[in-house]
């Protein structure tokens, strides 16, 4: 189970509401803030600490306990002035990690300049994931974990079946690290190097962000 932390969400549009619900479902503490009472009322059904306030008011944020949050999320990417103010206020209050939603790359870079530790551009990110999936039907899920590496869940490649990690030597040849295998509804962690891949396995691995370009090579091993 994930460590319990406190997240403050500034902006309760569809993205903010969904995020608040998911974090609450994962037993995390959420402070949900928006100046629109209608949106606050929507999340108050599942978030105990849902507040109607203008988050450009740093004193009001401090009084709401925002300074004790572990992570802040600013979701108002289409309203740049509000997003900038939200990021700056969270940082000034000492929130250690601030994530901001942006509607384009230019806005994302600006939010990073004013203090956001990470930005997300949902439409752009979705398009990238879609393109990767179209290039290789073997990729089930792919999430960037940093600027260089991704976490992937893939269908076991046909040429891997009947072979083990020692034989495939994925780490040395392709810098691919297998961290788990899902088989028959069970998840195998700390995979033994002698464990042979079986048909219908789903493999969890960490690799470079451009690994999808090399799937044809991986399937020829």
Task: Give the predicted meaning of each segment.
Residues 1-221:
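Cytosolic regulatory regions of ion transport systems
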């Amino acid at each position: 189970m994930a460590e319990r932390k406190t997240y403050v969400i500034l902006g309760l549009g569809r993205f903010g509401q969904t995020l608040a619900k998911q974090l609450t479902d994962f037993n995390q503490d959420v402070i949900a803030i928006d100046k629109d009472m209608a949106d606050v009322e929507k999340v108050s059904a599942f978030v105990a600490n849902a507040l109607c306030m203008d988050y450009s008011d740093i004193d009001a944020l401090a009084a709401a306990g925002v300074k004790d949050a572990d992570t802040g999320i600013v979701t108002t990417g289409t309203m740049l002035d509000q997003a900038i103010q939200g990021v700056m206020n969270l940082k000034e209050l000492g929130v250690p990690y601030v994530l901001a939603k942006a509607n384009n790359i230019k806005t994302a870079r600006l939010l990073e300049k004013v203090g956001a530790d990470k930005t997300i551009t949902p439409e752009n990110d979705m398009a990238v994931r879609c393109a990767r999936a179209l290039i290789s039907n073997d990729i089930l899920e792919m999430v960037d974990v940093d600027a260089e590496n991704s976490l992937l869940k893939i269908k076991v490649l046909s040429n891997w079946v009947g072979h083990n990690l020692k034989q495939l030597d994925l780490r040395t040849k392709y810098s691919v690290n297998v961290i788990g295998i899902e088989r028959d509804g069970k998840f195998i962690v700390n995979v033994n190097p002698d464990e042979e891949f079986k048909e219908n396995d789903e493999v969890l691995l960490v690799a470079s962000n451009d690994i999808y370009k090399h799937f044809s090579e991986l399937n020829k091993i």
